[in-house]
């Protein structure tokens, strides 16, 4: 008779258990839908889970179809360690059971610790992990292989730096300031390098020539005083983050004060050459004209002499003829 209350209690709990099992079965993806096994996702190690409790969550999605002609890529910027949830969805008119799903990191295939599920004509795959160091940065790609392969890629990188795109021009003896910024990010440390080749040399802060200043955490400034022509080279600013480093270079061109005068001097030289050419041409023309006038004058004199001689010769016969008639 004492067993009755226990039996009644067990019978009372049975509907609740059945209801709970039904709910779990409904929420669990079935193999008939072409999904993965019951638990395709392997949880990260306990230590990483504990560390990840205080990390922010980064969730990103990529959508693909059987008609996608090009791989789809998405760039993601990370400054600090984070929990990451990547989801790819693939829509096809074919059989979802015939689609092979894989994940790769930088070309190397990942373990089967990702989730695959299907809804209607769409196949979903989800990869969850935690990025805690620079080795886990890189490219994560999901692949759907049917008749042809479709790929979606998530590119993880640290924030980019922004300097001056065009070369910075200054003059010998002046001072200049090089600036690097990181928008909406705060690096742990800044470093400046100079390079006129493939070798980068750290800028000596102890020298009076260089002054490094960082008024704000997201920017750094390098002041160079008493510029020389050999100071014209590439300068690199490097920002250190928890997940890696980022660099930006600024080109510095140092000119002497004679350089701006060169175009003016060239113009002056061209003007002088043009004026000299014009003067020589005029002098040559005048000289030629003078010779021409002298030649004409000489011809006129010769013509006059010729006319005079002809006149004298004509007068002599007439004089003789008159003498003969007089006799």
From Swiss-Prot:
The lineage of its organism: Eukaryota, Metazoa, Chordata, Craniata, Vertebrata. Gene3D superfamilies: Immunoglobulins (2.60.40.10). It is a single-pass type I membrane protein. Interacts with SLC16A1, SLC16A6 and SLC16A7. One of its GO terms (cellular component) is synapse. Residues 291-308 have a biased composition (Basic and acidic residues). The modification Phosphoserine is found at residue 309. Residues 71-158, 159-253 form the Ig-like V-type domain. Residues 287-327 are annotated as: Disordered. Pfam families: I-set (PF07679). The gene is EMB. Plays a role in the outgrowth of motoneurons and in the formation of neuromuscular junctions. Following muscle denervation, promotes nerve terminal sprouting and the formation of additional acetylcholine receptor clusters at synaptic sites without affecting terminal Schwann cell number or morphology. Delays the retraction of terminal sprouts following re-innervation of denervated endplates. May play a role in targeting the monocarboxylate transporters SLC16A1, SLC16A6 and SLC16A7 to the cell membrane. Residues 282-327 are cytoplasmic. It comes from the Eukaryota. InterPro entries: Ig-like_dom, Ig-like_dom_sf, Ig-like_fold, Ig_I-set, Ig_sub. Residues 1-32 form the signal peptide. The chain crosses the membrane at residues 261-281. This is Embigin. Disulfide bonds join 88-142, 180-237. SUPFAM superfamilies: Immunoglobulin. Keywords: Cell membrane, Disulfide bond, Glycoprotein, Immunoglobulin domain, Membrane, Phosphoprotein, Repeat, Signal, Synapse, Transmembrane, Transmembrane helix.
């Amino acid at each position: 008779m004492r067993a009755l209350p226990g039996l009644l209690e067990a019978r009372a709990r049975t509907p609740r258990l059945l209801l709970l099992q039904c709910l779990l079965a409904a929420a669990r993806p079935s193999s008939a839908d072409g999904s993965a096994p019951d638990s395709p996702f392997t949880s990260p190690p306990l230590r990483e889970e504990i560390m990840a409790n205080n990390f922010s969550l980064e969730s990103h999605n990529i959508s693909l179809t059987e008609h996608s002609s090009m791989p789809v890529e998405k760039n993601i910027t990370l400054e600090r360690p984070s929990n990451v949830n990547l989801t790819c969805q693939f829509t096809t008119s074919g059989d979802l059971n015939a689609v092979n799903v894989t994940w790769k990191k930088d070309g190397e295939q990942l373990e089967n610790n990702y989730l695959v599920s299907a809804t209607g004509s769409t196949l979903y795959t989800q990869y969850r992990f935690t990025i805690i160091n620079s080795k886990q940065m890189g490219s994560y790609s999901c692949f759907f292989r049917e008749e042809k392969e479709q790929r979606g890629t998530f590119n993880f990188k640290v924030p980019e730096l922004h300097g001056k795109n065009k070369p910075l021009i200054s003059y010998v003896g002046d001072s200049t300031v090089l600036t690097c910024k990181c928008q909406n990010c705060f690096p742990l440390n800044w470093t400046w390098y100079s390079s006129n080749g493939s070798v980068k040399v750290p800028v000596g802060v102890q020298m009076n020539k260089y002054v490094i200043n960082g008024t704000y955490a997201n920017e750094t400034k390098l002041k160079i005083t008493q510029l020389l022509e050999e100071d014209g080279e590439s300068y690199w600013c490097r920002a250190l983050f928890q997940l890696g480093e980022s660099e930006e270079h600024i080109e510095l061109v140092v000119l002497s004060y004679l350089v701006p005068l060169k175009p003016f001097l060239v113009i002056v030289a061209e003007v002088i050459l043009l004026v000299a050419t014009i003067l020589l041409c005029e002098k040559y023309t005048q000289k030629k004209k003078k010779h021409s006038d002298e030649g004409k004058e000489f011809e006129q004199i010769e013509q006059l002499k010729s006319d005079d001689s002809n006149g004298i010769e004509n007068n002599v016969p007439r004089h003789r003829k008159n003498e003969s008639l007089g006799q």
